[in-house]
């Protein structure tokens, strides 16, 4: 077993028999020799210049002749396994299992069926069924109806609104007792009351609102006459007609007017 010193780098034996005096290692620098050409050790073996091998012209000619004979022999056999013509179908067989063509064009099969005669000569399509057989199979299939919509679309909602509006027109509107002796009583409340807007040409349903208008929104509203029965004068104010889309007309507002 040897122990190496860090200073002298000389081996020191642990046995007394192999002991030697420690000596330092002296390295002598030598100049490299001046060579005219030095081999490049970084060049891979594949990029080195290949040596010209001796080629026998007679053996090369013999190999060419055998290859030509083999190619001619394989081409002469009709059912050779290496030729794709073995798997081609005759015109009679193609007519038996022809897929559905588009506009009677044989080269449009790629548009209607997954198997194409243009790319694949041996299609695996089954003969087409008759029209009656196909209709019977379609009639026997269970049809899945879409779930019924809970919310009505725009057309159904308009039909329902028009029907309820026509029913409310036929019925007499309940009148509310006049407030403070006013001449024009307030219109009654109906659950489904609508009106026609002349500016938009549509029906508007006032479902869920407190008051339902019975007049056209574009008619001029006049102030009601002052009440003479009570000391406080009541003036009925209504919102003026708007030129924009008439979606909602606010009901009449009665404000007490006190004289100073």
From Swiss-Prot:
<dbReference type="GO" id="GO:0005634">
    <property type="term" value="C:nucleus"/>
</dbReference>
<dbReference type="GO" id="GO:0160111">
    <property type="term" value="C:axonemal A tubule inner sheath"/>
</dbReference>
<keyword id="KW-0206">Cytoskeleton</keyword>
<dbReference type="GO" id="GO:0065003">
    <property type="term" value="P:protein-containing complex assembly"/>
</dbReference>
<keyword id="KW-0744">Spermatogenesis</keyword>
<dbReference type="GO" id="GO:0005654">
    <property type="term" value="C:nucleoplasm"/>
</dbReference>
<dbReference type="GO" id="GO:0048471">
    <property type="term" value="C:perinuclear region of cytoplasm"/>
</dbReference>
<dbReference type="GO" id="GO:0036126">
    <property type="term" value="C:sperm flagellum"/>
</dbReference>
<keyword id="KW-0963">Cytoplasm</keyword>
<dbReference type="GO" id="GO:0030154">
    <property type="term" value="P:cell differentiation"/>
</dbReference>
<dbReference type="Pfam" id="PF15181">
    <property type="entry name" value="SMRP1"/>
</dbReference>
<dbReference type="InterPro" id="IPR028195">
    <property type="entry name" value="SPMIP6"/>
</dbReference>
<keyword id="KW-0966">Cell projection</keyword>
<keyword id="KW-0969">Cilium</keyword>
<dbReference type="GO" id="GO:0005739">
    <property type="term" value="C:mitochondrion"/>
</dbReference>
<dbReference type="GO" id="GO:0005829">
    <property type="term" value="C:cytosol"/>
</dbReference>
<comment type="similarity">
    <text>Belongs to the SPMIP6 family.</text>
</comment>
<keyword id="KW-0496">Mitochondrion</keyword>
<comment type="function">
    <text>May participate in intramanchette transport and midpiece formation of the sperm tail. May play a potential role in somatic cell proliferation.</text>
</comment>
<dbReference type="GO" id="GO:0097225">
    <property type="term" value="C:sperm midpiece"/>
</dbReference>
<keyword id="KW-0221">Differentiation</keyword>
<dbReference type="GO" id="GO:0030317">
    <property type="term" value="P:flagellated sperm motility"/>
</dbReference>
<protein>
    <recommendedName>
        <fullName>Sperm microtubule inner protein 6</fullName>
    </recommendedName>
</protein>
<dbReference type="GO" id="GO:0007283">
    <property type="term" value="P:spermatogenesis"/>
</dbReference>
<comment type="subunit">
    <text>Microtubule inner protein component of sperm flagellar doublet microtubules. Interacts with alpha-tubulin.</text>
</comment>
<keyword id="KW-0282">Flagellum</keyword>
<dbReference type="GO" id="GO:0005737">
    <property type="term" value="C:cytoplasm"/>
</dbReference>
<dbReference type="GO" id="GO:0002177">
    <property type="term" value="C:manchette"/>
</dbReference>
<dbReference type="GO" id="GO:0043014">
    <property type="term" value="F:alpha-tubulin binding"/>
</dbReference>
<keyword id="KW-0539">Nucleus</keyword>
């Amino acid at each position: 077993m040897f122990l190496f010193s860090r200073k002298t780098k000389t081996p020191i034996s642990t046995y007394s028999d192999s002991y030697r005096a420690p000596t330092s290692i002296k390295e002598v620098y030598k100049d490299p020799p001046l060579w005219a050409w030095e081999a490049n050790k970084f060049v891979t073996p594949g990029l080195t210049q290949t040596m010209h091998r001796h080629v026998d012209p007679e053996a090369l000619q013999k190999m060419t002749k055998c290859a030509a004979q083999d190619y001619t022999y394989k081409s002469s056999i009709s059912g050779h396994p290496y030729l794709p013509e073995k798997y081609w179908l005759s015109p009679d067989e193609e007519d038996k299992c022809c897929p559905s063509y588009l506009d009677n064009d044989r080269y449009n099969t790629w548009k209607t069926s997954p198997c194409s005669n243009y790319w694949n000569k041996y299609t695996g399509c089954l003969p087409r069924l008759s029209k009656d057989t196909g209709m019977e199979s379609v009639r026997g299939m269970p049809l899945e109806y879409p779930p019924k919509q809970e919310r009505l679309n725009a057309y159904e909602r308009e039909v329902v609104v028009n029907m309820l509006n026509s029913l409310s027109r036929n019925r007499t509107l309940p009148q509310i007792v006049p407030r403070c002796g006013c001449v024009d009583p307030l219109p009654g409340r109906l659950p489904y009351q609508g009106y026609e807007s002349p500016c938009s040409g549509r029906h508007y349903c006032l479902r869920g609102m407190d008051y339902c208008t019975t007049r056209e929104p574009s008619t001029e509203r006049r102030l009601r006459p002052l009440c003479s029965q009570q000391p406080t004068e009541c003036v009925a104010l209504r919102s003026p007609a708007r030129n924009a889309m008439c979606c909602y007309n606010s009901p009449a507002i009665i404000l007490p007017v006190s004289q100073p």
